[in-house]
Amino acid sequence: MSKQIMVGGVAVGGGAPVSIQSMCNTATENVEATVQQILRLEQAGCEIIRVAVPTEEAARAIPAIKARIHIPLVADIHFDYKLALLCAEGGIDKIRINPGNIGSKERVRAVADACRERGIPIRIGVNGGSLEKDLLAKYGGITAQALVDSAMGHVRLLNDCGFDDICISVKCSRVPVNMAAYQMLRAQTDYPLHLGVTEAGTPEMGVLKSAIGIGGLLCMGVGDTLRVSLTADPVEEVIAAKRILQAAGIRRSGPDLISCPTCGRTKYDMIPIAREVERRLHGCDKPITVAVMGCVVNGPGEASGADVGIAGGKGEGLLFAKGKILRKVPQEQLVDALFEEIDKL
């Protein structure tokens, strides 16, 4: 089991539930825009939120933002260690840095000391695009071993400063490399791991890459917190994260819709019905499994694990629950009958 750190009031690692993170795409110094985006993310289910801090103005906005939100706030720092110190003074809940890119060991120690005094954890955030030149030369490019060596070098740097309140990420945009790096890292350290596939792209491909790269690791028991990185509204990242956690069997946050791919036995126009059921399930928070099946011959049996479901036929279909047929229903009433049964659950 990994060690546990506290990011504000959210436990990460040590058997705590896998938490969902996102990152604002607003200018952090624009407090109003940033707060409004965070409030939308909270409503969607985000549990830890990160903001970029590239300037002193952004760092000084941290207290005003924290005062109006309800989830832990993380500062993303590159190069300027003084910005990390300002954020620590402003009450930040976690700092993300690469210790190797903020200067001398004295500067790293200053950040470590400021965080230790205030109980602020540090995430070592290694990205394939910013690997050290010597590691790129040693391994001939971005490899899993290069990512892990970079991360462990940063860990030693913080440990040498007497700092142990650490979370680690090793992200790149190539899913197999990403997964291998996290598996290697898990074998070498028990610090909590922040999962993600960086630069995953737009939702169409980015969600697929993240589902494989993050969901695959979660199914192997690797990972303590995650962010799905998408070129999109950050709320979409949170929705995707919840779906990945549900598909991996980690957390249920609503209904699970199962439906068959249809075949020659299907005697009704099932695809639009499945989509209508999916649409009407939005907003439902019941942790149930709902089935839409293509035929009355195999449907109820194949979906016997579903809490409730429908199977269509020619002109009429079946409403069933836990594999047992409840009644026949005219085809045009199937969806309404299904949701009447869902309301009873």
Region annotations inferred by a language model:
Residues 68-71, 88-95, 116-119, 186-192, ...:
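Glycine-enriched alpha-helix->loop->beta-strand junction motifs that scaffold or abut catalytic
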Residues 25, 31, 42-68, 96-104, ...:
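Glycine-rich, proline-tolerant flexible connector loops at the mouths of alpha/beta enzymes
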Residues 55-77, 110-122, 182-193, 277-279:
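Alpha-helix-loop-beta-strand connector modules within alpha/beta enzyme cores
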Residues 127-130, 135-282:
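Catalytic alpha/beta core domains of metabolic enzymes, predominantly
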